[in-house]
């Protein structure tokens, strides 16, 4: 069985306990990915609760990736909250991010990448409000389940002894595989996504989206919690996903294997985040690279070159963090 309302050359599969099951979702009407993932995570914590050595729990929720599916009670919390539109929400978020110190005076709000909200019809605005309500409901369910997980960690007496990292892999995406246009987002029968306007608002104040190497595609949230080690606050030091493994090895004393399945490994590229967690200045990466399809970028210090299948562009991210002034054209 393929995806609902979508023609594919291959079938989609899901698996539980190493058993591959055909079909795009569970036949259980009460099944929801985020809930199920958390159930299994809690079971794993119970399984390893008596271990003396450190453990790592990797919990990769699929939410809020499309398709937009959420429980009705979660959707109801957010219905109507997005009718002011993506333009005003971008402005509000930009203002609040400045007030919170998340961004600074050099950050400029990039031009809108979508149709103006005021140009939509009343029905279109209603439809867009529902899309974002479902998207928010999916994130709400993530929050609920993280609460369940954290409660379990506390019950095991490991809260003060645990480093918790919460992050996402990329910026919001503009993809539009809305293959069930006659079915509103929310139920399992639908296959809908958020619009470009909402993806643009999600990436405030940066340019572009997922699948590009502009800041809107690669600059993502990273939250770390470790009682007694990490003090509340924010840092502007640059990190990368490759640093996570290096950090875990630094904390636990684990060694990177020289061979895996008989094959020699290459030296890992990540740098431990532990100095940053301790409030210290970490020696930065000499350079960081990104590549996805036709998108490429290299960052050295504050300078970044980036392209999307065309000519290279150059930006000074300290003076121009939202990539508004292409120095290659100067």
Task: Explain the meaning of each model-derived region.
Residues 57-69, 108-117, 166-174, 290-294:
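Short, solvent-exposed turn/loop segments enriched in Gly/Ser/Thr/Pro and often Arg
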Residues 50-57, 158-164, 201, 283-285, ...:
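Loop/turn elements at helix/coil->beta-strand transitions in domains of secreted/extracellular proteins
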Residues 51, 64-70, 171-178, 279-285:
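Secretory-pathway/luminal and periplasmic proteins that interact with or process carbohydrate-rich
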Residues 19-27, 75-79, 126-132, 186-189, ...:
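Flexible glycine/proline-enriched surface loops and loop-helix/loop-strand junctions
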Residues 37, 134-149:
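Outer-membrane beta-barrel transmembrane strands
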């Amino acid at each position: 069985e393929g995806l609902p309302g979508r023609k594919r050359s291959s079938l989609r599969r899901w698996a539980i306990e190493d058993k591959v099951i055909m079909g795009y979702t569970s036949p259980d009407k009460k099944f929801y990915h985020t809930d199920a993932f958390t159930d299994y995570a809690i079971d794993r914590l119970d399984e390893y609760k008596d271990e003396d050595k450190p453990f790592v729990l990797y919990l990769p929720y699929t939410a809020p990736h499309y398709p937009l599916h959420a429980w009705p009670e979660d959707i109801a919390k957010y219905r109507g909250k997005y009718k002011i539109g993506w333009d005003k929400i971008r402005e509000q978020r930009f203002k609040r991010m400045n007030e919170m110190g998340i961004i600074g005076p050099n950050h400029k709000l990039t031009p809108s990448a979508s149709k103006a909200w005021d140009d939509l019809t009343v029905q279109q605005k209603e439809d867009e409000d529902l899309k974002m309500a479902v998207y928010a409901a999916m994130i709400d369910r993530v929050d609920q389940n993280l609460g369940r997980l954290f409660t379990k960690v506390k019950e095991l007496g490991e809260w003060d002894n645990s480093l918790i990292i919460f992050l996402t892999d990329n910026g919001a995406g503009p993809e539009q595989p809305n293959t069930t246009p006659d079915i509103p987002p929310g139920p399992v029968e639908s296959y809908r996504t958020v619009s470009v306007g909402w993806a643009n608002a999600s990436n405030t104040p940066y340019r572009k989206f997922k699948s590009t190497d502009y800041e809107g595609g690669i600059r993502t949230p990273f939250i770390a919690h470790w009682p007694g080690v990490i003090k509340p606050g924010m840092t502007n030091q640059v990190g990368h996903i490759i640093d996570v493994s290096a950090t875990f090895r630094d904390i636990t004393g684990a060694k990177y294997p020289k061979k895996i399945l008989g094959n020699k490994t290459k030296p890992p590229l990540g740098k431990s985040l532990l100095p940053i967690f301790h409030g210290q200045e970490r020696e930065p990466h000499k350079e960081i690279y990104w590549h996805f399809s036709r998108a490429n970028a290299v960052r050295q210090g504050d300078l970044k070159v980036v392209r999307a299948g065309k000519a290279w562009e150059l930006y000074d991210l300290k003076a121009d963090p939202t990539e508004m002034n292409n120095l290659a054209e100067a």
